Design a protein with these regions (language model features):
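Gly/Ser-rich "nucleophile elbow"/oxyanion-hole loop immediately N-terminal to the catalytic nucleophile
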Residues: 254-289
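Primarily recognizes the serine-hydrolase "nucleophile elbow" in alpha/beta-hydrolase
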Residues: 282-325
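C-terminal catalytic histidine-bearing segment of alpha/beta-hydrolase fold enzymes
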Residues: 336-340, 358-433
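N-terminal secretory signal peptides and thylakoid transit peptides that target proteins
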Residues: 1-15
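Active-site machinery of serine-nucleophile hydrolases
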Residues: 210-264
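A domain-start/cap signature at the N-terminus of enzymes
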Residues: 27-52, 75-201
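Short beta-strand element of the alpha/beta-hydrolase
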Residues: 200-209
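Short beta-strand/loop motif that positions the catalytic acidic residue
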Residues: 332-334
């Protein structure tokens, strides 16, 4: 009997069937079947996706033996087939793995699942003014989790089921819990330790949005680029750092400008990590999206000397409360399609300017390429301001397939925001005196 959970996985396109041909050794005499299969997932701007299947063979397969048309994946589009020396998305001329790469544009590839406490109808939040009326510290009856990707692979008349999942970058984070004696809270978190820890390095704190509230420790890693991007090998080669991504199981900030006790617990956790690792206390950076951005703003207000700089994405706060952060280094990012963050950031930056803060502003396009962002960044930062405020112009954060209803403009802001390298550069150029 098919369980509801298995049904959800099936309709979400998680369980896929891969048909592989019989691969023949170069000598043309030995037909062999794959011995093992591994699902490969990757976190993109809109979440973790099943991106490929690595099929292991008992000999080094050469690229000349492979053809895209020889492979098919039920419900998916095969974009590339190539040999590899290790499980991942790095091709090689030959190797013991055949990587069946899948198209990013395929529909229904999300691994996210809603988790309900009791009846799903009872889990709907109370609404006020057309939006959820959440309260800081509140446990949600509807949370999320991310399922493990699986694939059923057919080759030579036999069937293999993936025996493991290789999560690119996300697997390099360690999971732990911190029991805070001062607040009485226990906080789950993900922690990335850089390869070279001989000298003190910066730490980046990323805090997720309310929609990622979950009991699953890794949910914040899988939701988008906010935590993952800093641990990307290419990023670490340029800007090595520690990365802290707490996983909150309750609402951490609300629209009445209250925060959960997790705010203090997170600060206490960072202080603990500084004591235990070679972390530069003058280069602690905060970033967050939506509710995480709100909490980061509240941290800047309550602990104005704690962070070297902050990247605040698609959040809001009361302009009447931001005076204590007037000396801080902040990059604000919102979209004109975000009916909450855009007016709030406008009010906040105007209030800070009244206090003498130099803020440089620009309207950017969410569809720009790497070179366009670089040019716009160079132009804006030439003004050498204390704070920067960039806004994605109307309709520019949406892809052709994106809905424009509800909070889509809000969510699509952070899908793009963390992919802009020059802003990450700016953050790391800041240091407390």
């Amino acid at each position: 009997m098919q369980t509801r959970r298995k049904f959800l996985l099936t309709v979400a396109g998680v369980a896929v069937a891969v048909a592989a041909p019989s691969l023949v050794h170069a000598a043309g005499k030995l037909a062999v079947s794959p011995s093992q299969a591994t699902a490969i997932t990757q976190v993109l701007g809109d979440g973790v996706k099943l991106m490929a299947v690595a099929v292991a063979y008992p000999y080094a397969v050469s690229a000349s033996e492979l053809n895209v048309s020889d492979f098919s994946v039920a419900g998916r589009t095969v974009s590339k087939v190539f040999p590899a020396k290790t499980i991942g998305l790095t091709p090689s001329d030959s190797g013991p793995y055949v990587i069946v790469q899948l198209a990013e544009t395929d529909a229904n590839t999300s691994l996210q699942e809603d988790v309900y406490e009791g009846n799903p109808e009872d889990a709907k939040p109370q609404m006020q003014g057309g939006k959820p009326n959440w309260v800081a510290g509140q446990k949600m009856k509807k949370t999320i989790r991310f399922n493990e990707a699986t694939a059923s692979i057919s080759a030579n008349g036999s069937t293999l089921t993936t025996s493991s999942t290789h999560n690119l970058i996300a697997d390099s984070f360690r999971q732990a819990e911190f029991s805070d004696s001062k607040t009485g809270k226990t906080l789950k978190y993900n922690f990335f330790i850089p390869e070279n820890t001989q000298k003190a390095l910066p730490l980046v704190l990323f805090m997720h949005d309310a929609g990622v509230t979950s009991e699953q420790t890794k949910a914040t890693l899988y939701q988008g680029l906010g935590a993952i991007i800093w641990a990307d090998p290419a990023e670490q080669a340029k800007r090595p750092c520690y990365v802290l991504a707490p996983q909150y199981d309750e609402i951490i900030a609300d629209d009445d400008w209250r925060t959960s006790k997790y705010l203090e617990t997170t600060i206490h956790l960072i202080q603990k990590l500084i004591r235990e690792h070679k972390i530069d206390p003058k280069r602690i950076y905060a970033t967050g999206q939506s509710g995480g951005c709100m909490t980061a703003t509240a941290m800047n207000i309550k602990y104005p000397n704690f962070f070297a700089a902050s990247y605040l994405v698609a959040g809001k706060w009361s302009a009447n409360l931001v005076a204590p952060m007037a000396k801080n280094k902040v990059w604000w990012m919102a979209s004109e399609d975000d009916l909450g963050a855009f007016p709030s950031f406008n009010a906040i930056t105007e209030r800070l300017e009244q206090q003498g803060v130099k803020i440089s502003r620009a309207v950017w396009n969410g569809a720009w390429n790497v070179d366009q962002y670089r040019f716009a960044y160079d132009d804006l930062t030439a003004e050498r301001a204390q704070m920067y405020y960039t806004v994605f112009e109307k309709d520019s954060v949406f892809r052709e397939t994106d809905s424009r209803q509800g909070a889509s403009g809000h969510r699509n802001t952070w899908r793009i925001a963390y992919s802009i390298e020059p802003i990450r550069e700016w953050l790391f150029s800041q240091k407390k005196k």
